[in-house]
A protein has these predicted regions:
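Glycine-rich phosphate-binding loops at beta-strand->alpha-helix junctions
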Residues: 41-45
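Short, well-ordered secondary-structure micro-motifs within conserved domains or adaptor modules
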Residues: 36-39, 79
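Positively charged, polar, low-complexity stretches
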Residues: 16, 24-28, 46-73
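A residue-level structural signature of the nucleotidyltransferase/glycosyltransferase Rossmann-like core
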Residues: 19, 61, 80-81
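C-terminal structural segments of small proteins and small subunits
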Residues: 68-96
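Small/polar loops that bind or transfer phosphate-bearing groups
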Residues: 39-40, 84
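N-terminal first-folded block
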Residues: 6-36
Length: 96
């Protein structure tokens, strides 16, 4: 079971410190290091395949949540998020 409140807090820290990238297209063109991709449980199959291809090319980890990212990020239709801070990514993975 995932610790939803802790994961939400760490994602919130990443957003406030501008260490998060939103959306599959933005993740694909982002040039700097990404440490973790977080996907929502309601992501479509085609988008999930696209994210998996990106992750395989760049050797990234994917974490699928049991809940919606929209509730955490307060952004409408947010289903994919990348974390660019190593420590926050590690903390999110440890609480998943």
């Amino acid at each position: 079971m995932q610790n939803e409140s802790k994961i939400a807090a760490y994602i919130g820290f990443a957003i406030k410190s501008k260490q998060a990238v939103f959306g599959a297209d933005s993740i694909e063109v982002y040039r700097k290091k990404i440490h973790l991709i977080v996907i929502s449980d309601d992501l479509t199959v085609k988008s999930k395949e696209n994210i998996e291809n990106i992750a395989n090319k760049r050797n990234l980890e994917i974490l699928q949540l049991d809940f919606s990212l929209q509730d955490i990020t307060k952004r409408k239709n947010c289903k994919v998020l990348a974390i660019t801070n190593f420590e926050l990514a590690k903390a999110i993975k440890n609480n998943a």
